[in-house]
Design a protein with these regions (language model features):
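A polyanion-binding, active-site-adjacent surface
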Residues: 2-154, 159-200, 204
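Extended, histidine- and acidic-residue-enriched regions that form the cofactor-binding/catalytic faces
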Residues: 173, 207-214
Length: 214
């Protein structure tokens, strides 16, 4: 078995375990969004979001698709010449957390803890050179794997080191965040930081982390 086949087999095991997980009482009727639709396990850059959206990934089974957050994410990726085929996308919570009203809500600390082993194993399998967190929840979730003292407010769009990897915390691409916390022009600048981090990583490696187009 080749190294790539071994990675794929390990990922398949994690996908199967996540699909059967019922640790969170409030999400027992939800299904984990984790499959080949998340991206290639050979990807060298991983984006981590908060959780699948009710109108987006919970319905489409593909991270950041089917809703406005997904459209924004695709636009921001394209602005630095990245495509989904080049990256792996997952989230801090693999199932969609919903309020009693049926709307999206933030995953609880317990729910994030329950999902942290899936996130840890996914990171280990994919083994990305660069991790990009989308929003404060994703950044906080990394603490459950390897401690850090970063906050999104202080660390946004600043290249960091975490668990032996390059980490770039940026804001979530949701319409709410774009309207109130990080406008489109600012987010576009944040993605340029991601692009620079990729180029810098490429300079330090014989084999490029990822090819991007200016």
């Amino acid at each position: 078995m080749s190294a790539q086949e071994s990675k794929q087999a390990r990922f398949t095991d994690v996908v199967a375990e996540a699909a059967c997980c019922r640790l969170c009482p409030a999400m027992c009727e939800r299904t984990a969004v984790l499959s080949e639709l998340n991206g290639s396990v050979a990807a060298r850059i991983m984006f981590i979001g908060e959780a699948p959206g009710r109108k987006g990934a919970d319905r489409t089974r593909k991270p950041f698709s089917g809703d406005q957050s997904g459209k924004n994410f695709d636009r921001f990726l394209a602005s630095i010449g990245l495509s989904r085929q080049q990256i792996f996308i997952t989230s801090a919570a693999l199932c969609n957390p919903r309020a009693d009203s049926g709307s999206n809500r933030k995953p609880s600390k317990t729910e994030l803890t329950n999902c942290s082993d899936f996130l840890r194993r996914t990171i280990e399998i994919v083994d990305p050179g660069i991790v990009v967190t989308l929003g404060s929840v994703a950044l906080e979730a990394l603490k459950l794997i390897e401690s850090h003292d970063l906050s999104l407010k202080e660390s946004a769009a600043k290249v960091q080191s975490w668990d032996g990897r390059v980490l770039v915390p940026i804001y979530h691409p949701s319409p709410q965040v774009l309207a109130s916390h990080r406008r489109e022009a600012e987010q576009l600048r944040d993605y340029k930081v991601v692009a620079r981090a990729i180029k810098q990583a490429n300079h330090l490696r014989t084999k490029p982390v990822i090819q991007i187009h200016d």
